[in-house]
Amino acid sequence: DSKVLPALGRFKHEAVAEDFLHKHLYLTEDTPDGGFYRFIPDGLTKDGKINFSSGKLQIAVLNGDSQEGKVEWKNIKDPNPPIWQILLKINELRYQVKDSAKFNGGEGIAYYEGKIYFATKGDNKIWCYDTKIQNIIVLYDHSTHPNPILSGVDNIVFSSSGDLFVAEDGGNMQIVAIDSGGSLVPILQIMGQDESEITGPAFDPSNERLYFSSQRGKSGSASGGVTYEVKGPFIKI
């Protein structure tokens, strides 16, 4: 059953990932000047899971105009303002903290070995936030990379071997992996579906099958979506 979670904030939610070690949530915002958010629950459920009913919603702050470096987290005072305020662009969460860092169209997000990775579609970047040292860097930048084959960055997922698979929304309709050394490896490309986007990449528990969807398929319409299975195994690339 669906359930509203007011403590997680009222904003243009895109994706969420759990820091399994600290039991924190990290959230992206799909807007050109979006925030990067963290939710710290007040406690856990009896079975050790995150209690979504209450906690602190925070937004990332960086020093000056820098988009890399040490992150400071500041509390959102009013995480769930009335909907009319949001519609009138009054009291939007990312503006409640004046110096919050701005990210150009937050998209997919994933956790791996103490780090949070997320994509921003407006500038075709992949970011990496280290939860231990609370520092953020740009892992991939289409505008400066010597081999910029990855564009339209969107949904992301990690293989069990630690390679980051990035799905393209448009671009060349590819899934491209970023290995631990930062090299780009094209995994697959869908042809003849230029009006679509690749969504929801996920691995089965054995890491031998990759699943993903083409949101609008060949027809380009919402009813034309197709889901694919790719057999591996997906060992270290």
Enumerate the predicted regions with their spans:
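Sequence/structural signature of beta-propeller domains
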Residues: 1-237
